[in-house]
């Protein structure tokens, strides 16, 4: 039940737990996940990101990350600045999907970012990810901003569409 979900900004210890879980689940992408863990811990320490976690019965079941600085966002022009935040890493453990947990975390995150002075949020999605595009549209990300390419540490290249929404 979503009402029992604890929504919070993650601690460094919680980040390490979540990243180790993701690395263990990653399969053939393991090297990318190891690099992403190191990068995200450093970004957190520098104050460039805010990781938001949904915790149920002591377990991290969903997450999202707010990226606050252009240095940590690929194709950052128009996506992140002093009043615009870039959102990424929307993840929910499979067995908890479709039960309202991520929705509760998302609204917690948006409220927190609004209180921090952000007036717009942006995100990126691969055009082939129709389910994710539908979810993002449901959350109000309907303002098309641009397209671009993003690069994984292993050299994988992704086509990405970027969308925004005003934080009201």
Predicted segment positions?
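Conserved N-terminal entry element of GNAT/NAT acetyltransferase domains
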Residues: 1-21, 168
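Active-site rim helix/loop that mediates acceptor-substrate recognition in acyltransferases
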Residues: 28-56, 65, 71
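Conserved beta-strand in the GNAT
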Residues: 53, 59-70, 74-75, 86, ...
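Conserved acetyl-CoA-binding loop-helix of GNAT-fold acetyltransferases
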Residues: 92, 98-111, 138
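Conserved active-site alpha-helix within GNAT-family acetyltransferase domains
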Residues: 103, 128-145
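Conserved GNAT acetyl-CoA-binding A-motif
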Residues: 113-125
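Conserved beta-strand-loop-alpha-helix junction that forms the acyl-donor binding cleft
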Residues: 123-133, 150-154
């Amino acid at each position: 039940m979503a009402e029992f979900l604890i929504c919070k900004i993650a601690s460094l210890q919680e980040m390490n737990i979540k990243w180790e879980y993701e690395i263990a689940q990653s399969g053939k992408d393991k090297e990318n996940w190891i690099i992403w863990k190191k990068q995200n811990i450093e970004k957190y320490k520098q104050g460039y990101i805010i990781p938001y976690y949904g915790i149920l019965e002591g377990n991290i079941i969903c997450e999202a990350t707010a990226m606050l600085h252009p240095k940590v966002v690929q194709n950052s022009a128009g996506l992140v600045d002093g009043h615009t935040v870039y959102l990424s890493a929307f993840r929910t453990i499979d067995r908890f999907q479709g039960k309202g947990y991520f929705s509760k975390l998302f609204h917690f995150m948006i409220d927190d970012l609004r209180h921090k002075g952000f007036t717009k949020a942006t995100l990126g999605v691969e055009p082939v990810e129709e389910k994710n595009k539908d979810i993002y549209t449901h959350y109000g990300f309907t303002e098309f901003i641009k397209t671009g390419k993003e690069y994984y540490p292993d050299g994988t290249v992704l086509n990405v569409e970027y969308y925004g929404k005003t934080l009201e």
